[in-house]
Amino acid sequence: MADDNKDNDNEIIFTPKNIKHCEEKSNKFFNVLLANKNNFNKKECKDAFEDLSQCCEASNNLPDPVDKIHPAVKLLQHCLPRLFTNDLPRERTIIADTLAYLMPKVFDPEDDDEDD
């Protein structure tokens, strides 16, 4: 029983964070594994897996990535909905007003005075 707990402490947990950080080493491991026809017992495979596991252990201590939104994107997220929607009774917007102006001209063009 004590040995089981000891083995679990040394277990490597692969997460998206550490796999993303160690993408080059994971690609190398899988390429070596495929080159050796899925024979994990060869020295190259074991060495590549050891490199990958060391990288994953090291990356487990990295902080989680923080997604920072650029101030310009925040401004657009704030302003764009207000450009295209407002609180008027019929929800008149810039796009709706523009389409209401253009569509009659597109589908019902004025007759040209070429007969004169």
Swiss-Prot record:
This is Putative uncharacterized protein DDB_G0287517.
